[in-house]
């Protein structure tokens, strides 16, 4: 593995999101001095917090899986996650609701899920689910250490017996077809393949290897931190500070000072911070601009679809909603065509509805509730641009409300006391390329050793972390990216065998 050469005693981490904080903790654990610079006044990055009218609203990811990766970050500085953060295991992990009126609670406990599938779709589908679960577990074991939790220096690193094992498992076939090999019910196929949407590839075209995301969601477990998702970066930042990190909030990095091929200082709008190495976690275009160079690629990068998010604080709730409810539209395949090809808004939307107060009522005033609705939309490269979204956003908000009232949440509009709307305008303003928080799509030419590297040619002591580089998009992979960035500076730490997520208290 290629590592940063020369002195690496003091490392500046740009960005106090999950990737930056994971990098900071692993660097501190290896004995480095660490300064973290964050433009916002609080840690979190994409996992931010909005407080309004007594509501505590998470502005970023709402799904937490693979908490063992969080545990690893705390363990790097000799701490236990449980001493900093309480995680609640959600049961069910999701509730899937379909256009035909049927619904399925998705359990991560194998026996409970098998029974639910049998009641939902019959004994044959339950047997298929059992086989699918075994396949997902094998897929995870083959991929995690060799293809996900690894720093690639060359595609030749793929030449390993695990590659043959992945091929034997059907990992290079198509995701939807492979899921269909186990369960033929169209609704079940959606439950185990919808995750590809956030990776930016339709299930019919995505590699079956991406079912590893379904493993994380439907086998390893879905969790929620007491206090909301923002409690996670807050706990990580506190642990980093207690371990000796200096955290500079409210400072925007304006440039990197260089001497030849080395970065010698990080310059903010308030101070000049000398460094031996730097970890950059902003979105790729921002990091490349700071470095003064963009790596050449044979083909332009393709980005994942974006999302419109509607945050609502309400005076009532809808008890049929689980903590996470996926409301599938009928036109599932057409949805992907609209999002990735024609650039149109979903004509029959599939939505993720999150009700965090179902698990932690303290996030809202007494008797009040929080609801978060994520509606995938085209990114600004293939769909409406920023200028169009300024006019389109309020109209689309009204369309979403009407659709939600027609489906799961009648009377929603009248129940809203606080709300916030996030569109590609906001993602663009935050520095996210193509107006999407989901960064570079996980097409085959943008995965593994072909994804933008965390080292940039021409700079010997700068390392990238975050969802745009390896291994990719999602909370677990972003945490891994921070660890991988740290290892580029410190060298590899003691390797661990892949583990399933630990248990936790159940919702």
Swiss-Prot record:
This is Phytoene dehydrogenase. Belongs to the carotenoid/retinoid oxidoreductase family. It comes from Streptomyces griseus. Its cofactor is FAD. SUPFAM superfamilies: FAD/NAD(P)-binding domain (SSF51905). GO terms for molecular function: oxidoreductase activity, acting on the CH-CH group of donors. Pathway: Carotenoid biosynthesis; lycopene biosynthesis. Its EC number is 1.3.99.-. The keyword RNA-binding does not apply. The keyword 4Fe-4S does not apply. It holds the Pfam family Amino_oxidase. Keywords: Carotenoid biosynthesis, FAD, Flavoprotein, NAD, Oxidoreductase. InterPro entries: Amino_oxidase, Carotenoid/retinoid_OxRdtase, FAD/NAD-bd_sf, Phytoene_DH_bac_CS. It is an enzyme of class 1 (oxidoreductase). One of its GO terms (biological process) is carotenoid biosynthetic process. FAD binds at residues 12-45. Transmembrane segments: none annotated.
């Amino acid at each position: 593995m290629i590592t940063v050469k020369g002195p690496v005693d003091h490392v500046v981490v740009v960005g106090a999101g999950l990737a930056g904080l994971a990098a900071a903790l692993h660097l501190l654990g290896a004995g480095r001095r660490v300064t973290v610079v964050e433009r916002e006044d609080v840690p979190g990055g994409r996992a931010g917090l909005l407080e309004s009218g007594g509501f505590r609203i998470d502005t970023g990811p709402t799904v937490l899986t693979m908490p063992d990766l969080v545990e690893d970050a705390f363990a790097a500085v000799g701490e236990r996650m449980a001493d900093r953060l309480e995680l609640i295991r959600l049961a069910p992990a999701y509730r899937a609701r379909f256009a035909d009126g049927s619904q399925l609670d998705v359990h991560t406990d194998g026996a409970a899920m098998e029974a639910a599938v049998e009641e939902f779709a019959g004994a044959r589908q339950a047997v298929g689910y059992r086989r699918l679960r075994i396949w997902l577990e094998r897929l995870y074991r083959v991929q995690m250490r060799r293809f996900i939790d690894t720093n690639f220096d060359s595609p030749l690193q793929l030449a390993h017996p695990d590659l043959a094992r992945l091929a034997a498992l059907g990992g290079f076939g198509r995701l939807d077809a492979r899921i269909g090999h186990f369960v033929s019910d169209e609704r079940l196929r959606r439950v185990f393949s919808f995750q590809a949407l956030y990776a930016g590839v339709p299930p019919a075209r995505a590699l079956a290897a991406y079912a590893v995301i379904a493993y994380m969601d439907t086998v390893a477990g879905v969790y929620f931190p007491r206090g909301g998702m923002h409690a996670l970066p807050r706990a990580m930042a506190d642990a980093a500070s207690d371990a000796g990190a200096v955290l500079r909030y409210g400072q925007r990095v304006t440039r990197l000072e260089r001497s030849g091929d080395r970065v010698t200082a990080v310059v903010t709008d308030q101070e000049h911070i000398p460094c031996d190495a730097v970890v950059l976690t902003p979105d790729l275009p921002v990091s490349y601009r700071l470095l003064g160079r963009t790596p050449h690629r044979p083909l332009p990068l393709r980005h994942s679809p974006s999302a419109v998010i509607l945050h609502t604080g309400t005076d009532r709730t809808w008890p049929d909603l689980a903590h996470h409810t996926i409301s599938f539209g009928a036109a599932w395949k057409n949805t992907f065509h609209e999002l990735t090809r024609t650039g149109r808004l979903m004509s029959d939307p599939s939505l993720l509805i999150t009700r965090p107060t179902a698990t932690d009522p303290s996030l809202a005033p007494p008797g009040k509730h929080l609801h978060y609705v994520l509606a995938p939309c085209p990114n600004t490269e293939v769909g409406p641009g920023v200028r169009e979204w300024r006019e389109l956003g309020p109209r689309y908000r009204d369309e979403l409300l009407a659709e939600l009232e027609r489906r799961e949440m009648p009377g929603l509009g009248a129940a809203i006391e606080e709300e916030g709307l996030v569109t590609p305008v906001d993602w663009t303003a935050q520095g996210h390329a193509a107006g999407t928080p989901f960064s570079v799509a996980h097409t085959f030419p943008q995965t593994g050793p072909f994804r933008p590297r965390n080292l940039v040619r021409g700079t010997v002591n700068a390392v990238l972390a975050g969802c745009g580089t390896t291994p990719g998009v999602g909370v677990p992979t972003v945490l891994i990216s921070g660890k991988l960035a740290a290892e580029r500076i410190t060298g590899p730490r003691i390797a661990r065998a892949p583990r399933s997520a630990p248990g936790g208290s159940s919702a």
